[in-house]
Swiss-Prot record:
Pfam family, one: RuvC
Gene coding for it: ruvC
Species: Burkholderia mallei (strain ATCC 23344)
HAMAP family: RuvC
InterPro entries, alphabetized: RNaseH-like_sf (IPR012337), RNaseH_sf (IPR036397), X-over_junc_endoDNase_Mg_BS (IPR020563), X-over_junc_endoDNase_RuvC (IPR002176)
Any one of the GO BP annotations: DNA repair
Keyword Methyltransferase found: no
Binding note for cofactor: Binds 2 Mg(2+) ion per subunit.
Gene Ontology molecular function, alphabetical: crossover junction DNA endonuclease activity; DNA binding; magnesium ion binding
Protein name: Crossover junction endodeoxyribonuclease RuvC
GO cellular component terms attached to this protein's record: cytoplasm; Holliday junction resolvase complex
Length: 180
């Protein structure tokens, strides 16, 4: 199964594509969709078009996207929600089922700790997908979203989803940190 993960943002929307076979995760692609400095409709159109292009290029079976959190600034929350909506429209018009997860669910599922830092997310994603380096923060969150969805959005450590992948690398998670 191929999963497209999306980390929505108005300026930068992260994406990550993985293949899943049982507990095996394989990296396919990741990156960002950058919007131009332009009016809001143009930026939303860029996100929609970018997601549509990703679907054509990578032919995913399913998609996962981060839920919007309420920010201190209501205007920022509204803009993020609109960017997320443009991405969801692209996913749905591409025929994909879309799952939604909170940032807390994402971090809990991938790192094993709901308050994990960006750096911990990047490190865990790199290790789980056997990447030579850490992906950028937006791409790491999007890849993490795909990983989270691959394992049903649950806490992978307690379900054994992440444990086999880490054990093969001589690692485990303890108090939100990789040890090995």
């Amino acid at each position: 199964m191929r999963i497209l993960g999306i980390d929505p943002g108005l300026r930068v929307t992260g994406f990550g594509v993985i293949d899943v076979s049982g507990h095996q995760l394989a990296y396919v692609a990741s990156g960002v969709i950058k919007t131009p400095t332009a009016d809001l409709p143009t930026r939303l159109g860029t996100i929609y078009d970018g997601v549509s292009t990703l679907i054509r290029e990578h032919t995913p079976d399913q998609a996962a996207i981060e839920k919007v959190f309420v920010n201190v600034n209501p205007q920022s929350t509204l803009l993020l929600g609109q960017a997320r909506g443009a991405a969801i429209c692209g996913l749905v018009s591409g025929g994909l089922p879309v799952a939604e997860y909170t940032a807390l669910q994402l971090k809990q599922a991938v790192v094993g700790y709901g308050r994990a830092t960006k750096e911990q997310m990047q490190e865990m994603v790199a290790r789980l997908l056997s990447l030579s380096g850490r992906p950028g923060t937006d791409a790491a969150d999007a890849l993490g979203m795909a990983i989270c969805h691959a394992h049903g959005g649950n806490t992978l450590n307690t379900l054994g989803g992440i444990a086999p992948a880490l054990a093969k690398k001589g690692l485990r998670v303890r108090r939100g940190r990789l040890v090995g």
